[in-house]
Amino acid sequence: MLKLFAKYTSIGVLNTLIHWVVFGVCIYVAHTNQALANFAGFVVAVSFSFFANAKFTFKASTTTMRYMLYVGFMGTLSATVGWAADRCALPPMITLVTFSAISLVCGFVYSKFIVFRDAK
């Protein structure tokens, strides 16, 4: 399980970079609120994360249902963190770090036990 989590984390680093860049562009260039910026970062990064983890971490086939399960869960998580950040007036960097930590742990558990549960 630790080896699997290490692979998931490696892909997560790239995913996080993608997410953070999009988030920053939305906040500092497009001047959106944090909920929208966090969700936009998620949308761009989630497909990479899904396909990379399916192939390299879980060695599983990609199906529409698996993709929808993953995107639905992670999207809800992203929107919730962004909404809470706006309600609490958190600085954008705190929002990014918070979402990155929560999504790493929750995303791994959800992927392993729900999305890719019947994979190898």
Swiss-Prot record:
Residues 31-33, 86-88 are periplasmic. Disulfide bonds: none annotated. InterPro entries: Glc_translocase_bactprenl-link, GtrA_CellWall_Glycosyl, GtrA_DPMS_TM. It comes from Escherichia coli (strain K12). GO terms for cellular component: plasma membrane. GO terms for molecular function: glutamyl-tRNA reductase activity; NADP binding. Keywords: Cell inner membrane, Cell membrane, Membrane, Transmembrane, Transmembrane helix, Transport. The gene is yfdG. It is a multi-pass membrane protein. It holds the Pfam family GtrA_DPMS_TM. It is found in: Cell inner membrane. This is Prophage bactoprenol-linked glucose translocase homolog. GO terms for biological process: heme biosynthetic process; polysaccharide biosynthetic process. Residues 1-9, 55-64, 110-120 are cytoplasmic. The chain crosses the membrane at residues 10-30, 34-54, 65-85, 89-109. Its main location: membrane.
